[in-house]
């Protein structure tokens, strides 16, 4: 996809505006931004003393943890399906 074909939107995450460019739909990119904002606010509620940088890192760590769990679950499901097909 060429640079001209990419979607460009402005989103707000943790009370800051960001310009995002991507190949996904505007709706998808807005959903991603909304979920990041939600996760940052959830973590902030538990750890109000964190600065924005630390909060962003904890959000990334939590998100990657969730991603890896889902990836492992997906691999397990694929393995179960393959066994049933054999």
Curated annotation (Swiss-Prot):
Q: Which family does it belong to?
A: Belongs to the ZapA family. Type 2 subfamily.
What keywords appear on the UniProt entry? Cell cycle, Cell division, Cytoplasm, Septation
The record ties this protein, via Pfam families, to: ZapA
Instruction: Please state where this protein is localized.
Output: Cytoplasm
Q: What does this protein do?
A: Activator of cell division through the inhibition of FtsZ GTPase activity, therefore promoting FtsZ assembly into bundles of protofilaments necessary for the formation of the division Z ring. It is recruited early at mid-cell but it is not essential for cell division.
List GO BP terms, alphabetically: division septum assembly; FtsZ-dependent cytokinesis; septin ring assembly
The record, for HAMAP family, names: ZapA_type2
Assembly, in brief, is: Homodimer. Interacts with FtsZ.
Q: Which NCBIfam families does this chain map to?
A: PRK14126.1 (NF010724)
Q: Does the keyword Nucleus belong to this entry? A: no
InterPro entries, alphabetized: Bac_CellDiv_Activator (IPR053712), Cell_div_ZapA-like (IPR007838), Cell_div_ZapA-like_sf (IPR036192), Cell_div_ZapA_firmicutes (IPR023688)
Name the SUPFAM superfamilies on file.
Cell division protein ZapA-like (SSF102829)
Annotated Gene Ontology cellular component terms: cell division site; cell septum; cytosol; plasma membrane
State what protein this is by name.
Cell division protein ZapA
